[in-house]
Amino acid sequence: SLGSVASLEHGLTVDGLARRCLGEFGRVAQVYGSPDAPVRRAAFFNGSLGDNGEDALAAGADVVVCGECGYHRALDLLTRGCAVIILGHDTSETPLVGVLEERVVELGVSPKNLLCLGTEPLWHSVDG
């Protein structure tokens, strides 16, 4: 099932959306698609895209933003007119960490018994 779908502002491009993700999450995304391709509708999935690419296409998405997407799945979406922005699994779930923490405390778990991981990067990239 689809995470969420949004209609985006006029004039936004694939790279423009990827740059917004960088600004929000502070992590460089892997992007499949033409940098200047217009984005009108986006599908968002936290964690892995899994088999939800078909749902994104059916919803009319020009781009999928997700945490993980296999290479061949990304190529399939790309050849069918849908760009893919891959944030990293952990990065895509970071916005939910605080929400889940609050809910667990509401259910009676003491905050002193909670250890939340995922708010700081646990991995890094090496280049050059």
What positions do the PLM features span?
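Hydrophobic structural segments
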Residues: 1-128
